């Protein structure tokens, strides 16, 4: 190997990449063709793809039958988005050439990038028919299916790859296998592979995947351990806070669940789901005022956040704060938000506030959506009876009785009303 190339390598290894590239550039004119190929590979590894292409393009013209050079040239062209040119270069390699399977892999990669998954799959199977036990081909098939969301298929090929290698192209095979199993709903099967992946490469994404999957598998303590470790490693990894909070909740640690959700809000202040979850935990442990405040903040982020609205309305209803129910619904309606349950809440609130005309209008509007809801029908019928509207209440009571099957008190009420009308 040329001494200037050796010097350039030493400079880059010492962290002086710019000097290394300059030294390599100075060496170009005195390099033999074999060393030019080495220099091109170094340029590529050090991030100067254009210089790598300049050298390899000339070498490819000089040695068109050197198919390893051809594949490398195509790989460089793919890197600069010259996909059609790369494909044309790859198609010059004959099927009988030892480098042909590699060219098929590169073609498959190209077609996958273009969204032509079936063509990509065909190229990979063609390569596999030549080299049946090559882990790189199995891994490429796994990656193809993984990219398509066909996780069960991906599992098959990642498992085969994992028997031979734990890493390919800088990708941890055990992590990919674990992710595929988890995405397939095979949470328990994913756990041992996540354990291996975290041992080999404890990066935040792998730890998160492990913790999240452990929670899905019901291994709550493992989930808490992994997600807590991740929080310590990178507290700004916002996705960890919801599953960690839910893990604490599953252990009955509601205070810790609330605390964790609020920590998450500090890093992800526009996450309405975290506000809602924190509110539910606050309400669960009797912190009603804090719960209401968190729900109001969730609604400030999204006035149409239905679950937060329903939760806050339920709190107001439990606290018999009927004015707040009316004010909240009127406010969200002013934003153009609507939900069938609003009329039911309004009907109940107006009834309690003795605003009977408004209550009747709200019941009538709600009936369009809740005519098959037993609790609504009973409440509506009770309101009508209180208002002396027995004739209107009667069909509702009969419907409730039909749903209940047997209800002596209800039967007596119906008979009494029918008797009054028969006189």
Swiss-Prot record:
PROSITE patterns: TPR (PS50005), TPR_REGION (PS50293)
Lineage summary: Bacteria, Bacillati, Bacillota, Bacilli, Bacillales
Pfam families documented for this protein: TPR_15, TPR_19, TPR_8
SUPFAM superfamilies in the record: TPR-like (SSF48452)
InterPro entries (UniProt xref): CellSynth/LPSAsmb/PSIAsmb, TPR-like_helical_dom_sf, TPR_rpt
Protein name: TPR repeat-containing protein YpiA
Keyword presence, GTP-binding: no
Repeat positions for TPR: 33-66, 67-100, 135-168, 171-204, 238-271, 272-305, 306-339, 340-373, 374-407
Keywords tagged on the record: Repeat, TPR repeat
Organism domain of life: Bacteria
Gene3D superfamilies hit by this protein: Tetratricopeptide repeat domain (1.25.40.10)
Assembly notes: Interacts with the RNA polymerase core.
Species of origin: Bacillus subtilis (strain 168)
């Amino acid at each position: 190997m040329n001494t200037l190339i050796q010097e350039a390598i030493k400079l880059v290894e010492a962290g002086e990449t710019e000097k290394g590239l300059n030294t390599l550039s100075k060496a170009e004119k005195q390099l033999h063709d074999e060393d030019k190929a080495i220099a091109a590979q170094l340029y590529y590894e050090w991030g100067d793809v254009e210089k790598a292409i300049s050298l390899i393009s000339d070498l490819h013209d000089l040695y068109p039958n050197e198919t390893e050079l051809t594949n490398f040239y195509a790989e460089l062209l793919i890197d600069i988005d010259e996909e059609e040119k790369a494909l044309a270069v790859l198609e010059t390699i004959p099927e009988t050439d030892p480098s042909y399977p590699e060219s098929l892999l590169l073609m498959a990669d190209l077609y996958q990038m273009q969204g032509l998954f079936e063509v990509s799959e065909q190229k990979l199977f063609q390569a596999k028919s030549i080299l049946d036990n090559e882990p790189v081909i199995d891994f490429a098939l796994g990656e193809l299916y993984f990219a398509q969301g066909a996780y069960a298929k991906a599992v098959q090929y990642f498992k085969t790859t994992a028997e031979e290698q734990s890493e390919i192209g800088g990708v941890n095979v055990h992590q990919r296998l674990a992710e595929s199993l988890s995405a397939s709903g095979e949470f328990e099967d994913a756990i041992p592979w996540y354990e291996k992946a975290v041992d080999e490469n404890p990066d935040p994404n792998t730890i998160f995947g492990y913790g999240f999957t452990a929670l899905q598998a019901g291994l709550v303590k493992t989930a808490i351990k992994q997600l807590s470790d991740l929080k310590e490693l990178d507290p700004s990894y916002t996705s960890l806070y919801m599953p960690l909070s839910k893990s604490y909740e599953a252990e009955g640690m509601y205070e810790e669940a609330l605390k964790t959700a609020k920590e998450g809000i500090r890093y992800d202040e526009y996450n309405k789901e975290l506000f809602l979850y924190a509110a539910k935990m606050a309400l669960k442990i009797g912190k009603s005022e804090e719960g209401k405040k968190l729900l109001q903040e969730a609604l400030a982020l999204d006035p149409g956040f239905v679950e937060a609205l329903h939760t806050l309305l339920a709190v107001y209803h439990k606290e018999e704060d009927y004015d707040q129910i009316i004010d909240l619904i009127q406010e969200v309606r002013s934003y153009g938000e609507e939900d069938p349950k609003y009329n039911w809440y309004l009907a109940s609130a107006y009834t309690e506030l003795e605003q009977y005309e408004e209550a009747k209008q709200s019941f009538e509007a709600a009936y369009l959506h809740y005519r098959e809801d037993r609790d609504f029908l009973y409440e509506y019928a009770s309101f009508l009876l209180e208002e002396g509207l027995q004739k209107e209440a009667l069909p509702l009571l009969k419907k409730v009785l039909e749903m209940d099957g047997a209800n002596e008190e209800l039967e007596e009420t119906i008979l009494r009303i029918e008797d009054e009308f028969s006189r």
